[in-house]
UniProtKB/Swiss-Prot annotation:
SUPFAM superfamilies: Epsilon subunit of F1F0-ATP synthase C-terminal domain (SSF46604), Epsilon subunit of F1F0-ATP synthase N-terminal domain (SSF51344)
Organism: Acinetobacter baylyi (strain ATCC 33305 / BD413 / ADP1)
Complex formation: F-type ATPases have 2 components, CF(1) - the catalytic core - and CF(0) - the membrane proton channel. CF(1) has five subunits: alpha(3), beta(3), gamma(1), delta(1), epsilon(1). CF(0) has three main subunits: a, b and c.
Function text: Produces ATP from ADP in the presence of a proton gradient across the membrane.
Pfam families: ATP-synt_DE_N
GO molecular function: ATP binding; proton-transporting ATP synthase activity, rotational mechanism
Superkingdom, taxonomy of origin: Bacteria
Key words, A-Z: ATP synthesis, Cell inner membrane, Cell membrane, CF(1), Hydrogen ion transport, Ion transport, Membrane, Transport
Keyword Cell inner membrane found: yes
Name the UniProt record assigns to this protein: ATP synthase epsilon chain
Membrane topology of this protein: Peripheral membrane protein
Organism lineage: Bacteria, Pseudomonadati, Pseudomonadota, Gammaproteobacteria, Moraxellales
UniProt GO cellular component terms: plasma membrane; proton-transporting ATP synthase complex
Primary localization: membrane
Amino acid sequence: MATMQCDVVSVKESIYSGQVTMLIAKGAGGELGILPGHAPLVTLLQPGPIRVQLENGTEEIVYVSGGVLEVQPHVVTVLADTAIRADNLDEAAILEARKNAEQLLANQKSDLDSAAALASLSEISGQLETIRKIKNRAL
C-alpha cells in the first residue's frame, strides 16, 4: 500500500512523524481525507481530531486546537497551535472546563467575555469529539 510522510507538530513538540496511509482532519471547509499523491493543498484546521492511519493498519488520534494543514503529493504536515495525543486527554477535566465556559457565557459582562467563552467551547467540543473517536475505536 502507498504511504506518505506525515509530521504532526505543535508549538511545543513533535507529536508524530512517520509513514502513513491516510490522514483525516477537519479543515476550514469540512472534513478532509488525504491519501498519498493528493494534490497540493493548504488549509486552516478546526479544533478536533486528526486521525492518522499507519502502515500496520492501526490508527493514531491526535487532538488539535487549530492550525494549518499542508499537503504535498508525498508529505503531509500539520502545524498545530496545540496538539495532544487523544489518549492523554482528561475527560473529567474537559467536562469541568465546559461547565465553566458555559457559566462564563451565561454571566457575560462584555463582548470579550463572550468571545473567550465561545472560543473555549469550540476547543472543548473538539476535545470531546476526539474522546468519542477514541471510545468508538475501542468498540
